[in-house]
Amino acid sequence: NLTAIDQSTDTCTNNFATMNPLDNYYAQATFSEGNLKVATASSPTTYVTSTIGVTPNFKCYWEAKFDTTQSGNGEIGMVDKVTTGASAGGGASRLYYQRNGISVNDLGQVWGNNSNTGQSLGSLSTSDIICFAWDGTNNALYIRKNGDAWVNSGNPASGSSKTGAFVTPDSNITIFQAMGDQAGNTNSTASINLGSPPYSISSGNQDGNGYGNFEYAVPSGYFAINTKNLAEYG
């Protein structure tokens, strides 16, 4: 009784990233849908990361959506460190607390480097898809909701000018896609599409190499997170 959603495009010669159940020391999260849907526990406040680190100079695209929206408790984004053991920084283990952590919470607010950026995607529902485009060459992240304009008038094609981007303090970093809690009083659930979606896609967009299955168009020069793309461009 498998449907198309239950089938992965992953092969023995090309592996797509998923979320990593081994990076689960603090989070005590549960993983489903091929490790692309994550539900956090109600007490810890932390995050989990993806299985493939995106190396510097790679430009990647991914999508995600919240399956629960609970007043700013959930967050989805990227970070340059895993949480296993104490590497995330003791009690300050929220995703957006990290120096190179950038996230969108389930209120649509964009956070980074332990502060609210003042930018927002507007209100989010469980049907809204958050789009991320990371320019590793220029340490710049672009974010939008659905097919809307990129937040802060962002332009993923702007290169070193980083027009409207959320910029990490450090350059030349390896980043991971991440999901977690901003508050520890409840659990959050999100689905992450790193090229092989855990939810229904109506439009079916691919990157320039023909990889991935995304709801919205992949910006030119950005690619799904898989081993072939990283070998070619990473």
Give the predicted meaning of each segment.
Residues 1-234:
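PRY/SPRY (B30.2) beta-sandwich protein-interaction domains
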